[in-house]
């Protein structure tokens, strides 16, 4: 009898700690730069060729309500930590809070036995003065362009695993970032891995250098936004093809989203050392729409979100589930079977149950903030909480996003239907009990 109990105990212990292949997927997290929903054909976009991303949506789940912060640095802070930027005292642009370095999705992946890598954009430290920064945040391998140090596209200035990458002066940066991750996946095909592609595309070329960065070979102008969108789609396609060739696609969780909305202007060329821009309009569902990056309008915060995970997600699905940038860390944690430590102050909710078809939504509200949000109600456009339909700014303006998506008709306090009044009360309570909590 004692032998039987021992065997049963061993079985139970093993079954509680050993995850099946489907429970330990590889993860490919792709964060495009400056890409709103209107850029992708699968969201009704008509201005840019995004055939590979459109196909990805057909093979997985497309989220109608994916949101980011209105600019890149706050989004990256929230994505990595699962916490909203104001909760971390608004980390200075180009920085990361020191006491959070051990609390990122990459650190969770390492705890779960994953190999980790990042390529593309960092913007959380100057690589030349802090070469180990990505490693301290959990990324064992890295290939990142030198933000404020050199170009990201042509004649790129890239730090590879903490050392300046030599002999790449005639290369195209995005090709190198993509190939770096393909090589990483090949090397680790027999073990679980997390590859984070923080894309340079479709951000313009500017790096705040003393001299304008170079044009593409043979051109007297910079790549247009349309050309960059096509390149973005091509680079994503290269990664997806690599997963197929390595026979890893079935059990790889691929997430594609954007860090903020599309820019208001696109860079065309430089004259006398100054960059020249023109307004950027994109066509979506028959409407010409100017980008809204840095604003809290939908054009600044509503981004594509596509998830493919063949072992779990049925193809061709769409969902109205709400997702903001705090939700990715808990989602990856659940997919990896790695609990988030209770000491981590994570705001988000895992949307794995949505992917599995167990629920229609993982949360009732989402949040976005501008750089100025400090809980001061006198400042307009600093933050909002919202549902799919109703959007309440911290200054008290309420909008019905089903009938006023461009926010032309604010519903003032005491006005509107009973449904609008109920939504205001509910969302104000979220501000008071969730956002402003100590």
Where are these regions (language model features)?
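Positively charged n-region of N-terminal signal peptides that target proteins for export
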Residues: 1-4
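Bacterial N-terminal signal peptides
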Residues: 6-16
């Amino acid at each position: 009898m004692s032998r039987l109990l021992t065997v049963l105990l061993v079985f139970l212990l093993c079954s509680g700690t050993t995850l099946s292949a489907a429970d330990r997927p590889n993860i490919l997290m792709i964060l495009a730069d400056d890409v709103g929903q209107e850029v992708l054909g699968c969201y009704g976009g008509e201005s840019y060729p995004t055939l590979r991303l459109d196909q990805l949506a057909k093979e997985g789940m497309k989220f109608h309500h994916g949101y980011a912060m209105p600019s890149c640095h706050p989004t990256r802070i929230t994505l990595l930590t699962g916490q909203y930027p104001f909760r971390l005292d608004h980390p200075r642009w180009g920085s990361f809070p020191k006491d959070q370095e051990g609390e990122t999705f990459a650190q969770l992946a390492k705890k779960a036995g994953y190999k980790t890598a990042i390529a593309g954009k960092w913007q959380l430290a100057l690589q030349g003065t802090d070469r180990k920064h990505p490693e301290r945040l959990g990324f064992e391998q890295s290939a990142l362009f030198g933000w404020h140090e050199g170009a990201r596209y042509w004649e790129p200035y890239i730090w590879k695993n903490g050392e300046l990458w030599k002999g790449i002066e005639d290369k195209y940066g995005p090709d190198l970032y993509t190939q770096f991750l393909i090589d990483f996946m090949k090397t680790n095909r027999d073990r679980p891995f997390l590859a984070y592609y923080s894309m340079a595309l479709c951000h313009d070329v500017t790096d705040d250098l003393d001299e304008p960065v170079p044009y593409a070979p043979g051109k007297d102008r910079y790549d247009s936004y349309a050309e960059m969108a096509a390149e973005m789609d091509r680079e994503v396609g290269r990664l997806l093809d690599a997963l197929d060739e390595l026979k890893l696609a079935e059990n790889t969780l691929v997430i594609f989203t954007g860090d903020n909305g599309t820019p208001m202007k696109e860079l065309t060329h430089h004259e006398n050392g100054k960059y020249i821009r023109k307004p950027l309009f994109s066509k979506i569902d028959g409407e010409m729409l100017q980008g809204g990056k840095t604003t809290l309008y939908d054009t600044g915060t509503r981004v594509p979100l596509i998830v493919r995970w063949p072992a779990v997600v049925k193809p061709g699905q769409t969902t109205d589930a709400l997702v903001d940038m705090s939700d990715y860390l808990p989602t990856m944690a659940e997919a990896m079977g790695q609990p988030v430590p209770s000491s981590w102050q994570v705001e988000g909710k895992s949307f794995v149950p949505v992917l599995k078809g167990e629920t229609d939504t993982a949360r009732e509200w989402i949040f976005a903030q501008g750089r100025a949000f400090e809980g001061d109600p006198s400042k307009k456009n600093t933050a909002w909480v919202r549902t799919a339909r109703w959007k309440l700014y911290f200054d008290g303006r309420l909008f019905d996003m089903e009938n006023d998506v461009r926010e032309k008709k604010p519903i003032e306090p005491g006005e509107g239907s009973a449904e609008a009044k109920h939504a205001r009360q509910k969302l104000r309570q979220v501000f008071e009990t969730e956002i402003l909590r100590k």
